[in-house]
């Protein structure tokens, strides 16, 4: 008989074991220790044991769901009227027994008790405070299509797709040539790549998630004035080495002032950043973009990133 309860302190090893046995795709870090879950999930200041619900067959954890309220608009605390179900796992031997349905129903009830009226199914930037760096690379981008069951489960339980993300990687060991045009040549002559700590003006929400990862902010600056034309955040993805067999970095936010758009500065930034990471023996850069963000998808593809998966977020009317 399957029983359901909230998180207990004895659960971390059982959850780590379930993660390893759940046949997750390339979007999930592999070979994770209990310490990884302790650091990225259970040690978060807003972790609520009632938001992590497990399904048990006697003493064995065979499934779990994790839900949380979204961050507020100021990115200073949780408590918005929105929330999300950011993780759902059921052991392959226990699927098609309505365990996932029961877990998501209980997660929805938890969010309702927290005052949440709008629920997303799938990790997004405003709802996922726990699994950044463990699932989805460096950015929350929904449940991965590659995992195979999410779309059918969502349709069967009344969820409708509300957002899709394109998941990209750039192979830094490949023989493909970077693009060349007059703007890029001019940019390279007058700019250089600078590196800095990205946490200088970070918000509480940024620090609780990305502050737990190795990170660097790259800026493309004018040599003469030191004025920054574009910048981006890069995060270490060493937890993916067992799964991917290569050292990887994740691309976060890309920033460019409006007055500098139209000059390919952001493309120059990504190309110079790729060269630097290659010199540091990084062989893969992982990135994602909402399908509605045409500018980012076009930029990534122009810089040599290739789509390898799709992330999906769902909602209920």
Please tell me what each predicted stretch does.
Residues 1-41, 48, 52-57, 61, ...:
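Short amphipathic alpha-helix that is part of the acyltransferase structural core
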Residues 42-57, 63, 208-219, 223-228, ...:
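A short helix-loop-beta-strand connector motif used in the catalytic cores of GNAT acetyltransferases and
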Residues 61-87, 134-146, 151-152, 236-248:
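Conserved acyl-donor/pantetheine-binding loop and adjacent beta-alpha core of acyl/acetyltransferases
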Residues 63, 163-164, 228-230, 309:
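A structural microfeature
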Residues 72, 122-124, 138-172, 306-317:
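Conserved catalytic-core motifs of GNAT/GCN5-like acyltransferases
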Residues 85-95, 123-126, 252-262:
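A short, internal acetyl-CoA/4′-phosphopantetheine-binding micro-motif in the GNAT/acyltransferase core
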Residues 90, 96-109, 118, 262-276, ...:
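Conserved acetyl-CoA-binding loop-helix of GNAT-fold acetyltransferases
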Residues 111-142, 277-289:
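Conserved GNAT acetyl-CoA-binding A-motif
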